[in-house]
């Protein structure tokens, strides 16, 4: 596996002692420096075990590149999951947003809830909206709806 210049640069910065290998300690220190978060020992050891294909307890450049590539691929899958969640939320939002205003109003909420068998008056719907109406305009935007649904 041929590492790109970017991977080589990152590998070089992680390999603090210049021995051509990244130890668990070097990995943890560099993750903390890069992300500002301390990585628990268990996570460091799990990453090392996952990537250390030759079993020497260290990551050479090829193992490091493979690890980073796999982590990027996992991140892409999470983005796909996020995209699917967002798509589903947009579909749900569209069901409640019936007035063509791009937001859920107390009336549109009342109408949809009635269709679903829950009968509330407009004031009760206003109270429901108020809990997640971040900007206080009396309606729910998609972002506010998303926050509500993810709570």
Curated annotation (Swiss-Prot):
An example of a Pfam family matching this protein is EF-hand_8
InterPro entries from the xrefs? EF-hand-dom_pair (IPR011992), EF_Hand_1_Ca_BS (IPR018247), EF_hand_dom (IPR002048), EF_hand_pair_protein_CML-like (IPR039647)
Query: What is the role of this chain?
Result: Potential calcium sensor.
Which keywords describe this protein according to UniProt?
Calcium, Metal-binding, Repeat
Specify which residues bind Ca(2+) 2 according to the UniProt entry for this protein.
Answer: 52, 54, 56, 63
> Under the GO molecular function aspect, what terms does this record hold?
calcium ion binding
The residues that hold Ca(2+) 1 are: 15, 17, 19, 21, 26
Q: Where does Ca(2+) 3 bind?
A: 133, 135, 137, 144
Q: What is the designated name of this protein?
A: Putative calcium-binding protein CML23
Q: Where is the EF-hand domain?
A: 2-37, 39-74, 84-119, 120-151
Q: Which SUPFAM superfamilies does the UniProt record give?
A: EF-hand
